[in-house]
Amino acid sequence: MAILPIRIVGDPVLHEPTETVSESPAELSELIADMYDTMDAANGVGLAANQVGIPLRLFVYDCPDVDETGKPFRRRGCVVNPVLETSERPETMPDPDDDVEGCLSVPGEQFPTGRAEWAKVTGTDADGNAVEIEGRDFFARMLQHEVGHLDGFLYVDMLVGRNARAAKKTIKRAGWGVPGLSWVPGTVEDPFGHDD
């Protein structure tokens, strides 16, 4: 298995809708394993195929959640050809503390992002079996974030007001927003500080 370079905002593969997956589970197995390795090395909670330069409609996740009693646990899996359904997205400004979101393709940065409280994704898993996953709060945020990647946009594309202006300045200051930039987890310091 391999850790793959993660494309940075501005790379064309991140800004175009991905292609429907027609490959068999066997043909996808190495890519999916590499995506898990890459996500784990980056301490991510989700990773879309186009973030590693592959314009296919699939993502992997390893995301914290809470059960109905409030007990924390992790949900890990893969969804191929996901279809997203959500509750209504709030029209108010996102909370600067509760709605902060980050992205491995905008390394080290976080901005308040408005998301629906509930989301459900249907598709198939890594073995080709039908799958339906749903969640609330942070897990719902992750589902919306990853499907957004597959639809050709990043979370910074949906920011509003001062958050959009701040993201634009940050991207410009970092020299991002151009094709060909990437980073390889494990070869540089964790941009989100998980190495500390």
Swiss-Prot record:
Residues given in the record as Fe cation binding sites: 103, 145, 149
List of catalytic residues: 146
Uppermost EC category: hydrolase
A biological-process GO annotation: co-translational protein modification
InterPro entries given in the database record: Peptide_deformylase, Peptide_deformylase_sf
Bound cofactor: record note: Binds 1 Fe(2+) ion.
The enzyme's E.C. designation: 3.5.1.88
Keywords, in A-Z order: Hydrolase, Iron, Metal-binding, Protein biosynthesis
Gene3D superfamilies xrefs: Peptide deformylase
Substrates-to-products reaction catalysed: N-terminal N-formyl-L-methionyl-[peptide] + H2O = N-terminal L-methionyl-[peptide] + formate
Superkingdom of origin organism: Bacteria
Cofactor(s) required, per the database record: Fe(2+)
Gene Ontology MF terms: metal ion binding; peptide deformylase activity
Family: Belongs to the polypeptide deformylase family.
Function statement: Removes the formyl group from the N-terminal Met of newly synthesized proteins. Requires at least a dipeptide for an efficient rate of reaction. N-terminal L-methionine is a prerequisite for activity but the enzyme has broad specificity at other positions.
NCBIfam families: pept_deformyl (TIGR00079), PRK00150.1-3 (NF001159), PRK12846.1-4 (NF009483)
Protein name as catalogued: Peptide deformylase
